[in-house]
């Protein structure tokens, strides 16, 4: 285990849900790292579950997952030493905004990023680990165009705060309808929903469902995807936060929702793929592995694992 004296703390990169992040330098190797500092409650110390989850993350070695090199545990803080990445998908998309007009990414780049996102996700799901908090801010990109998933396991290690603060409302935009309606049976499908939201946002440059609270979030989802019912989603009416008085709406044509915001034509394969991710019923969503074998990715098959 490293000691904190091995690292020189450089500029602050940002504040996350759990931690403050700094750029750091490994004084021994000269390699840049990201230092994520989690302040510990002086009363309680580090929850053992957090340590357990974090040690799991150290075992997650994949080219599309940000490497966790080490964990430094001192009395009042936990410092996670991560591989340093130059950028994240949110900042990358923001940099393309012209004036106040968001711009989507070129579709070949969208496909390349989505492929890498699903490669990393499939690896984690095979290892029985959910992300739970996928959003453009924690998809990190380096100068070579490699995309890697960050913050894996942290949602589980530290718990997602229930009272979503304004800065954290972003997480809502990528949250699956089953979770919003109080489902406790989380499975890998919650990450797949987030992937669908991220895909739509890469195409248009704008979040697909930018709600400000759980109720509005569901309304935005149902306005586009249609209102769920028992025939489409058995047992939906039994979810704790299901609202029986919600106005029944048919689904809108997703291509018509997205096409005005991009110059490139959205083909049938892409739309079929997106529908496979954004199924209201979690049991109907594609798995990460199935998604990687979808015809939209045909040109990548020969690289597939």
Curated annotation (Swiss-Prot):
Residues involved in ATP binding: 13-21, 36
UniProt-listed Gene3D superfamilies: Phosphorylase Kinase, domain 1, Transferase(Phosphotransferase) domain 1
Catalytic residues in the record: 133
Modifications made to the protein after synthesis: Phosphorylation of Tyr-18 seems to be important to discriminate between the different cyclin partners for binding.
Cited SUPFAM superfamilies: Protein kinase-like (PK-like)
Disrupted-gene phenotype: Increases GCN4 level.
Effect of residue 18 to F: Reduces kinase activity. Abolishes interaction to PHO80 cyclin, but not to PCL1
Note: Present with 6160 molecules/cell in log phase SD medium.
Annotated function: Cyclin-dependent protein kinase (CDK) catalytic subunit that regulates multiple cell cycle and metabolic processes in response to nutrient availability. Associates with different cyclins, that control kinase activity, substrate specificity and subcellular location of the kinase. Regulates metabolic processes when associated with PHO80 cyclin family members (PH080, PCL6, PCL7, PCL8 and PCL10), and cell cycle and morphogenesis processes when associated with PCL1,2 cyclin family members (PCL1, PCL2, CLG1, PCL5 and PCL9).
Protein name: Cyclin-dependent protein kinase PHO85
Record organism: Saccharomyces cerevisiae (strain ATCC 204508 / S288c)
């Amino acid at each position: 285990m490293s000691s904190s004296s091995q690292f020189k703390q450089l500029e602050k990169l940002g504040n996350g849900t759990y931690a403050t992040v700094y750029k750091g330098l490994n004084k021994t190797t000269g390699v840049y790292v990201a230092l994520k500092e989690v302040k510990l409650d002086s009363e309680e110390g580090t929850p053992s579950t957090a340590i357990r989850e974090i040690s799991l993350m150290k075992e997650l070695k994949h080219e599309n997952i940000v490497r966790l090199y080490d964990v430094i545990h001192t009395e009042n803080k936990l410092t996670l030493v991560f591989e340093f990445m130059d950028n994240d998908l949110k900042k990358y998309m923001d940099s393309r905004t012209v004036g106040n007009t968001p711009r989507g990414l070129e579709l070949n780049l969208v496909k390349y990023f989505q492929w890498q996102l699903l490669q990393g996700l499939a690896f984690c799901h095979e290892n029985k680990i959910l992300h739970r908090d996928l959003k453009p801010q924690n998809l990190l990109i380096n100068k070579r165009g490699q995309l890697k998933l960050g913050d894996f396991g942290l949602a589980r290690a530290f718990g997602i705060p229930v009272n979503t603060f304004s800065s954290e409302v972003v997480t809502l935009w990528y949250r699956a309808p089953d979770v919003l309606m109080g489902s406790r049976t989380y499975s890998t499908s919650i990450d797949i929903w987030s992937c669908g939201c991220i895909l739509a946002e890469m195409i248009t440059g704008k979040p697909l469902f930018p709600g400000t609270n759980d109720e509005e979030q569901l309304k935005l989802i149902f306005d586009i995807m249609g209102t769920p019912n028992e025939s489409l989603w058995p047992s939906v009416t039994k979810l704790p936060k299901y609202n029986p008085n919600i106005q029944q709406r048919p689904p809108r044509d997703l291509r018509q929702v997205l096409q005005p915001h991009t110059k490139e034509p959205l083909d049938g394969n892409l739309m079929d793929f997106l529908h496979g991710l954004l199924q209201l019923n979690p049991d109907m969503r594609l798995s990460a592995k199935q998604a990687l074998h979808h015809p939209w990715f045909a040109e990548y098959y020969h690289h597939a694992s």
